[in-house]
Amino acid sequence: MFDTKALQAEQRQRASEISLHDGIDNQSVRFIAGADVGFEQHGEITRAAIAILRYPSLALVEYQVARVATSLPYIPGLLSFREYPALLAAWAQLQQRPDLILVDGQGIAHPRRLGVASHFGLLVDVPTIGVAKSRLCGDFLPLHQDVGAVQPLFDNDEQLGWVWRSKIRCNPLFISPGHRVSVGSALAWVQRCMAGYRLPEPTRWADAIASNRPQFQRWLRKNPDFLGKRRDMI
């Protein structure tokens, strides 16, 4: 049995340690990571992929995949505790550490201001941004259908991030700072990482690698000697 109240209290404590001041600028960033987490075997195994891209070319230079035994059942609002062990396992394998991480999930756009992007960013002390495909909390005004349409995401008077339509005829992305990135800069960094798809390149690659999608399989056939590892800790 898990102590939900204790985990929520830990979230509030860790959220108080989050910095929303920019720890990077456009000149200092050389490598950007994308991170994605999924589950296998009916949730018994957690799988995390981290892709490292060179900036600003957005060329893939390294990837790591880790699979670990899932330590926590799904509990709404506590997903980061379920996901971060696999992320840390993949992180430990990296040869090239990034200057910025885009995480598939929430940053501070979370009821207790600690989504997986914030939690992971705090643990590794690297600037992070949450790039989520759906809203967890907050409100926003109606969003135009045009590409590039954007609205701020608010919870009462607090701006948590942005709702941004990155591609026509696609649902918007919910972008929020994770750690050591400001609300204002979070959207700009995601926009710099786009290449015509709904998702920014770092998380698009992480998703493709984690799920072994055809995009990644084709790329592997062309780059058979590329640096990449899969680590199982089960």
From Swiss-Prot:
UniProt entry keywords in alphabetical sequence: Cytoplasm, DNA damage, DNA repair, Endonuclease, Hydrolase, Magnesium, Metal-binding, Nuclease
Gene Ontology terms describing biological process: DNA repair
Keyword Transcription: no
Pfam families, alphabetized: Endonuclease_5
Gene3D superfamilies: archaeoglobus fulgidus dsm 4304 superfamily
EC top class, as a word: hydrolase
EC number of this enzyme: 3.1.21.7
Membrane-crossing segments per the record: none
CDD domains: Endonuclease_V
Primary location class: cytoplasm
GO cellular component: cytoplasm
Reaction equations catalysed: Endonucleolytic cleavage at apurinic or apyrimidinic sites to products with a 5'-phosphate
UniProt GO molecular function: deoxyribonuclease V activity; magnesium ion binding; RNA endonuclease activity, producing 5'-phosphomonoesters; single-stranded RNA binding
Family recorded in the similarity comment: Belongs to the endonuclease V family.
Function, as annotated: DNA repair enzyme involved in the repair of deaminated bases. Selectively cleaves double-stranded DNA at the second phosphodiester bond 3' to a deoxyinosine leaving behind the intact lesion on the nicked DNA.
Protein name, entry field: Endonuclease V
UniProt organism field: Yersinia pestis
Gene encoding the protein: nfi
